[in-house]
A protein has these predicted regions:
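Non-catalytic structural scaffold of enzyme domains
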Residues: 1-218
Length: 218
């Protein structure tokens, strides 16, 4: 137990997405140790901060207040004992540099992890308008204006509690449009969309949540 890794999840943006990230972290740990007998003490220690932050993604004017609140929540954690951590939200990586400073360099970037994985490929991106316009993922094939609005509404419905299975079909339509426009892979660039990905049977989807979960347990 004393040798297990201590992982920090900065989540709550939204809560369903970071709960999904926590589950994927445990599942990827199990896959990495397949064949062995895992006891409870073998799993990593995980602190999951599900932070009820204001929606600074839709309202950039709330960004500074959100950052201050997240930093205040992080002060409740003994960061010196954390081995590594990640932000369970794509768009919240707009705050990555500030939060990396707060955590003493302990965070692993989901964005950089994904970019390394897809280097050299033509990528499509379904995400929040903020993630698309920010260029966090560099050049990517994005949905048209109607598609962006549809995806944003799907994300909001996930956060409001609509079952993921009921929303997956609408997302799949937008993903297939990007494939038809030449994307080799399509990235689920919002953690709420990663939840829906479990109900979409397409072999060219990239899930950043799964990739960061694998990275932090290495």
């Amino acid at each position: 137990m004393s040798d297990s890794k201590y992982i920090l999840i900065i989540g709550g943006m939204g809560p369903q997405a970071s709960a999904f990230a926590h589950r994927r972290l445990v599942e990827e740990f199990q896959l990495a140790h397949r064949g062995g007998e895992l006891g409870n003490a073998d799993y990593p220690r995980i602190t999951h901060l599900s932070i009820n932050v204001d929606d600074f993604i839709a309202d950039p004017g709330k960004k500074l207040g959100a950052l201050n609140y997240i930093n205040a929540c992080l002060r409740d954690v003994n960061l010196k004992s954390v081995d590594c951590g990640f932000i369970a939200c794509n768009t919240a990586h707009l705050l990555f540099d500030d939060l990396q400073q707060t955590t003493g360099g302990r965070l692993i970037s989901m964005i950089e992890t994904v970019k390394e994985s897809v280097a050299g490929q033509k990528i499509g991106l379904v995400a929040t308008p903020a993630t698309i316009s920010s260029g966090l993922y560099g050049e990517a094939i994005a949905p048209d204006e109607a598609g962006v609005l549809k995806i944003e509404e799907i994300i909001r419905q996930v956060i409001s509690g609509v079952p993921a299975r009921d929303l997956a079909g609408g997302l799949q339509i937008e993903i297939e449009k990007l494939k038809n426009r030449g994307a080799e892979k399509v990235m689920l660039g919002c953690s709420e969309l990663s939840i829906l990905g479990e109900f979409i049977n397409l072999d060219y989807i990239i899930d950043p949540v799964t990739l960061i979960a694998r990275k932090v347990i290495e």
